[in-house]
A protein has these predicted regions:
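Gram-negative bacterial Sec-dependent N-terminal signal peptides
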Residues: 1-21
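A non-catalytic alpha/beta surface segment that caps or lines the substrate-entry region
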Residues: 61, 154-213
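N-terminal hydrophobic or amphipathic helices/low-complexity stretches enriched
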Residues: 113-169
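Acidic/histidine-rich catalytic neighborhood of metal-dependent amide-processing enzymes
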Residues: 204-207, 238-330
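Active-site-adjacent substrate-binding region
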Residues: 317-424
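Surface-exposed beta-strand/loop patches in noncatalytic accessory domains
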Residues: 425-443, 459-498, 509, 515-523
Length: 523
């Protein structure tokens, strides 16, 4: 078979159309390097001559006119050729992906148009740019210390126990169902959290989305994603073994630990947080594209996106690599500063992965701010991916490397989740009066306290001591703060780092009357 190419022009962007004689015809967009691999490794020839005016600036943020350029092409190919293309990109370019699937020529041309500078500026104008101020140390640091590599490792094991998670197999379906149940169990008791599957009409596997609804700034959304599917490029059948432990059970497991830790601490964000496990990444970013398209069509104000694709293999000298192409430079700087603030011992590198190397590209194409921190420099990542050997054992049967990414991602989600343009609700004040005899105690609460200062104070007669505690009623020997002077004028404060219950105890050291005032930030 040979391609008979023709050029399709739209808004000054190059598109190549090729015709073959077997297999279903589909449209993909791809960069220069991937196009060269397509020309080389498929039994066809695509002769492309890309004029400078038809080349697109590599989208490193929103101000990249002076940087290098890369041609992006729209090509119609046999679907059977995608595995050959994906394998060639992995084998010879030492990276994943490299192309985006499009359901039609019109959709593909629209994607190319959105990659133009003018379209990106227009799209970004409708999206809120966060402040990127780092000021949530009191909330973030305690949670970082609670995160466990063993939890991440177990999720990697559970996901990779499927024969495969390919987007068209029963294993891919089962993995989606399992993850939905896992996240639902973690979220039990939280009415502000929903877990759902996103159905894709053209294939079997569903994406999974967990949502923590924001409090007073819920219309702004932060997304943390990874891809759920796996692939064995030598065998995509029901029985083809594709454990995908690093690619990308590790990313999904990392964001699951972020979700678990937030829920365990009762964290309630101001912005809405979404945790996404995308279907069908390995075949052209299909799942994330459908989701990003639906959010863009609905006008959803997604203020930040982070992609975790492969986190558990340390193949390079640095710990985390920020990929600078087809990502947002301002958000990349913010993530780098987060690592320096919360994980100062880690070494940070930068690299590029080319067009459409993972799901962040789907969001970038819609004008959203996206970042892609990665486990290694390009070409030094896990050598076992896309084979039956991408196992937990081949990353040392540990998840210490993934824990670094999970901690970074939690800092990202809390710092952005706690921020926003809407002014928060004022402190709540509750007052109580009464009297106590000598040695008599009386407890108050629970007070549904949000992040901030919880303060209790008393005035009155006699000598009444004051105690306060988070999560349980205090006693005279178990408390977070106390004030036990020689009068009934006492004050006690607690720094609340996550939403939860708080309680107050009064004890009559000597008989007296009291007036108790409790002030706190409501959840």
């Amino acid at each position: 078979m040979r391609f008979q190419p023709k050029t399709v022009a739209a808004a000054g962007l190059l598109a190549l159309c090729s015709f073959a004689h077997a297999g279903e015809k589909i449209w993909i967009s791809l960069g220069d390097a991937a196009l060269a691999q397509l020309q080389k490794h498929t039994p066809v020839a695509v002769n492309a001559s890309v004029a400078p005016s038809a080349r697109l600036a590599g989208t490193e943020g929103t101000t990249t006119a002076a940087r290098g350029t890369e041609g992006i092409h729209l090509v119609q190919v046999d679907e059977d050729d995608l595995l050959h293309l994906s394998g060639a990109v992995h084998r010879e370019l030492h990276r994943c992906g490299g192309f985006m699937f499009h359901p039609s020529q019109a959709e593909g041309l629209a994607t190319l148009q959105r990659h133009s500078g003018a379209a990106k500026v227009a799209a970004a104008a409708a999206i809120t740019r966060p402040s990127y101020v780092i000021d949530q140390q009191a909330v973030v640091t305690p949670m970082l210390n609670q995160m466990q590599a063993s939890n991440i490792g177990q999720t990697i094991i559970d996901l990779s126990n499927n024969v495969n998670r390919y987007y068209q197999t029963s294993g891919g379906v089962a993995a989606s169902d399992w993850l939905k149940q896992r996240w639902t169990t973690l979220a039990a008791g939280r009415s502000d959290i929903t877990v759902e599957q996103f159905t894709h009409a053209s294939w079997k596997q569903k994406s999974v989305i967990a949502t923590i609804k924001g409090t007073d700034n819920a219309n702004e959304v932060v997304v943390l994603g990874g891809h759920l599917d796996s692939i064995n490029q030598s065998n995509t059948s029901e029985t083809g073994r594709a454990p995908g432990a690093d690619d990308d059970a590790s990313g999904v497991a990392s964001l699951t630990e972020v979700f678990r830790t937030m829920v365990a601490n009762g964290y309630k964000p101001r912005r809405t947080l979404k945790f996404m496990a995308y279907a069908a990444e390995e075949v052209g970013l299909r799942g994330s594209q459908e989701i990003a398209n639906s959010y863009a069509n609905a006008g959803t104000n997604v203020v930040g996106v982070m992609q975790l694709d492969m986190t558990n293999y340390k193949g390079s000298v640095n710990d985390i690599y920020m990929y600078t192409d087809y990502t947002d430079s301002a958000q990349n700087t913010f993530v780098t500063n987060l690592i320096k603030t919360y994980l100062p011992t880690l070494k940070i590198g930068t690299d590029k992965c080319g067009y459409a190397c993972s799901d962040h590209a789907s969001w970038t194409a819609k004008g959203y701010y996206a970042s892609m921190p990665f486990e290694a420099a390009m070409g030094q990542d896990d050598p076992y991916i896309h084979t039956a050997n991408d196992t937990y054992a081949n990353t040392g049967s540990q998840a210490d490397n993934s824990l670094k990414f999970a901690r970074m991602a939690l800092a990202y989600m809390v710092e952005l989740g706690s921020d926003g343009s809407v002014i928060g609700t004022p402190d709540k004040t509750e007052s109580f009066t009464g009297s106590l005899t000598k040695n008599q105690t009386r407890s108050f609460g629970p007070f549904k306290a949000g992040v901030g200062t919880f303060k209790a104070s008393t005035t009155g007669t006699g000598d009444i001591d004051l105690y306060a505690k988070r999560a349980a009623v205090p006693t005279t020997s178990s408390y977070d703060c106390k004030s036990d002077g020689s009068t009934s004028t006492e004050t006690c404060s607690i720094n609340v780092t996550a939403n939860g219950d708080a309680y107050v105890l009064l004890k009559g050291y000597a008989a007296g009357n009291y007036s108790l005032t409790v002030t706190y930030k409501p959840q």
